[in-house]
UniProtKB/Swiss-Prot annotation:
Protein name: Interferon antagonist OPG040
Subcellular location: Host cytoplasm; Host nucleus
Protein encoded by which gene: OPG039
PROSITE patterns in alphabetical order: ANK_REP_REGION (PS50297), ANK_REPEAT (PS50088)
ANK repeat residue numbers: 29-58, 60-89, 93-122, 127-157, 159-188, 193-222
Induction / repression: Expressed in the early phase of the viral replicative cycle.
């Protein structure tokens, strides 16, 4: 039996099929009639099959909601959700339907799932399988921006730092700015932002990324300045300029991490660094 052309069947042939014992069986390609109806975005046929009991007779390897989430049109997703399909179900790859909506860049479908349950963006068999992380990996600024706007409270800092790591690693500046804007707006510790992967941006010599990072009050004091100087004077100058900014600012200069750091000692022992520091102070 080949059901791949079921969307072209006449009503008489379809009626005969629906009354047969083969209605919910897999065809020679391993797919059900519902699979082909969704693939063709055939809303009427999907409804007909659902009324016939398709959801109670699903094949083990088919996940209709996940499949429908890849469609640009949201009608079938709405119908399946209304029919009682579980939006938090994982498929055989460990993904939710929202994951596939993100993968396809279907913003309207993404919104449909998130409005129903915003926590879905963090569902996944592992942290790397969540829809939120997937959107970051895809560098989809629009979807991540929407996700962040729908979170009613702050979320796990470890997730955020992991996303920032991926963003810096991939050199996605706009995504990094979006994540740091969110991190800054939710920072209640009255301290500099701790971004462990600033060293990664330095090692990658990603000047554009560093310039964007240094627009925020991030912790620069985990960097070994002497090692950086041997490798890249331009980046060293950026770090010293940020250090001078912190020491001059009425708020940041009183932070313990600014008052008690190793940079001043390192600078004092190096003629080139001292000259760079003095020049930065004069310009500030």
């Amino acid at each position: 039996m080949d059901l791949s052309r079921i969307n072209t069947w006449k009503s008489k042939q379809l009626k005969s099929f629906l009354s047969s014992k083969d209605t919910f069986k897999a065809d020679v390609h391993g797919h059900s009639a519902l699979y082909y109806a969704i693939a063709d975005n055939n809303v009427r046929l999907v409804c007909t099959l659902l009324n016939a009991g398709a959801l109670k007779n699903l094949l083990e390897n088919e996940f209709p909601l996940h499949q429908a989430a890849t469609l640009e049109d949201t009608k079938i997703v709405k119908i399946l959700l209304f029919s009682g399909m579980d939006d938090s179900q994982f498929d055989d790859k460990g993904n939710t339907a929202l994951y596939y909506a993100v993968d396809s860049g279907n913003m309207q479908t993404v919104k449909l799932f998130v409005k129903k349950n915003w926590r879905l963006m963090f569902y996944g068999k592992t942290g790397w399988k969540t829809s939120f992380y997937h959107a970051v990996m895809l560098n989809d600024v629009s979807i991540v921006s929407y996700f962040l706007s729908e979170i009613p409270s702050t979320f796990d800092l470890a997730i955020l730092l992991s996303c920032i790591h991926t963003t810096i690693k991939n050199g996605h500046v706009d995504m990094m700015i979006l994540l740091l804007d969110y991190m800054t707006s939710t920072n209640t510790n009255n301290s500099l932002l701790f971004i462990p992967d600033i060293k990664l941006a330095i090692d990658n010599k990603d000047i554009e990324m560093l310039q964007a990072l240094f627009k925020y009050d991030i912790n620069i004091y985990s960097v070994n300045l002497e090692n950086v100087l041997l490798d890249d004077a331009e980046i060293t100058k950026m770090i010293i300029e940020k250090h001078v900014e912190y020491k001059s600012d009425s708020y940041t200069k009183d932070l313990d991490i600014v008052k008690n750091n190793k940079l001043d000692e390192i600078i004092s022992k190096n003629k080139e660094l001292r000259l760079m520091y003095v020049n930065c102070v004069k310009k500030n």
